[in-house]
């Protein structure tokens, strides 16, 4: 098994605490609402949202994947940090055992935030992880972030 790391940062005009609440803590209900073309639904299969929780994310018809299962590894409210692992379905296919993800939202002096994202791709056997595949996953995540950000800008009273 190989492990391939991919790290990225993206900025947002939304304050860190509000973005953490909307994108991470309430994302299971907000993201299907603001980006139904990307995610149809999110349901907890096991657990209450904390570490160990298993979630099933269902994608809309016409998507390349039907669903993905994720396990919550850490929810750190004080430091706006969230870690989870994709453990079944989706982009894992025949080459990946799991993908471990960490999102840390850091406040910026101008009142916005920086999302620091770390992805660890655990491949099966001696499979290689292609850079364009990692980049495509990052772009999909960024599109979800922008959908949430647009919603929050249009609804200044939401998720405060």
UniProtKB/Swiss-Prot annotation:
Pfam families assigned: Bet_v_1
Question: Main localization of the protein?
Answer: cytoplasm
Q: Which GO terms describe its molecular function?
A: abscisic acid binding; protein phosphatase inhibitor activity; signaling receptor activity
Specify which residues bind brassinolide according to the UniProt entry for this protein: 55, 82, 84, 101
In the UniProt record, which is one GO cellular component term?
Answer: cytoplasm
What is one process in the GO biological process aspect for this record? abscisic acid-activated signaling pathway
* Matching Gene3D superfamilies: 3.30.530.20
Q: Which UniProt keywords apply?
A: Allergen, Cytoplasm, Pathogenesis-related protein, Plant defense
Where is this gene product found?
Answer: Cytoplasm
Which top-level group of life is the source organism from?
Eukaryota
Q: Would you identify the family this protein belongs to, as annotated?
A: Belongs to the BetVI family.
Describe the function of this protein: May be a general steroid carrier protein.
Q: What is this protein called?
A: Major pollen allergen Bet v 1-C
